[in-house]
Amino acid sequence: MNLITEKKYEEMDVKELFKIFSDDKTNAAVRNILIEKHLYLAKILSRKYMNKGVDYEDLYQVASLALIYAIDRYDISKGFEFSSFATPTIVGEI
């Protein structure tokens, strides 16, 4: 993927990116941008479980992997917001 295409993807709306990704699940550039744009969700959810005896870094790592799993499974045609779809997946993995 060239730099110009990646810049174009970074400027796109999240819904547009999910439409592109749902058409082509092998598009690594779009997948990476979606992950970067939603890492805050993994960070917020992992912070909620910080004082439960597990290191924050471990919680964040598990939450990040669950986020990637949720991005791969998300179906935009169902009409749900991504955060509503991903939150139970991430919390379940934590």
Put a short name on every predicted segment.
Residues M1-I94:
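Alpha-helical promoter-recognition and RNA polymerase-docking modules of transcription initiation factors
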